[in-house]
């Protein structure tokens, strides 16, 4: 009987040790998983921020080019229609610089709404969740 009890005791110790190792292994695995997820999340966030900044810069550049073309075109139209003489049109202005300044300056007065029109958000109906049909 002594041998039997000693054998069970040893088995019990082995099970406890295995459980402890398993618990430790699961904890380590969970910690590494968490680190991995946080790493991927931070890299994704950096990529998104960099992408948004890049798109914003390209948009600003394109707006500057478009503004320059509009400015130049407006001068040509004004001269062609006789509103101003070609000689009176300032020659030292560079359309790209004027467009760049216009893009960087904030509006002095906010844009006004046309009379009688309202741009308030319409009330939303309550969201209703639908279950897919089987």
UniProtKB/Swiss-Prot annotation:
Lineage: Eukaryota, Metazoa, Chordata, Craniata, Vertebrata
Gene Ontology process terms (BP): chemical synaptic transmission; synapse organization; synaptic vesicle endocytosis
Function: May be involved in neuronal plasticity.
Record's keyword terms, sorted: Cytoplasm, Phosphoprotein, Repeat
Spans annotated as Disordered: 97-134
GO function terms (MF aspect): cuprous ion binding
Chain positions found as Phosphoserine: 118
Name assigned to this protein: Beta-synuclein
InterPro entries given in the database record: Synuclein (IPR001058), Synuclein_beta (IPR002461)
Tissue-by-tissue expression: Specifically present in synapses around neurons but not in glial cells.
Subcellular location: Cytoplasm
Superkingdom classification of source: Eukaryota
Bias type Acidic residues, positions: 98-134
Stretch list, region 4 X 11 AA tandem repeats of [EGS]-K-T-K-[EQ]-[GQ]-V-X(4): 20-67
Post-translational modification remark: Phosphorylated. Phosphorylation by G-protein coupled receptor kinases (GRK) is more efficient than phosphorylation by CK1, CK2 and CaM-kinase II.
GO cellular component terms given for this protein: axon terminus; cytoplasm; neuronal cell body
Pfam families: Synuclein
Primary localization class, coarse: cytoplasm
Organism: Bos taurus (Bovine)
Swiss-Prot/TrEMBL Sequence repeat ranges: 20-30, 31-41, 42-56, 57-67
Family: Belongs to the synuclein family.
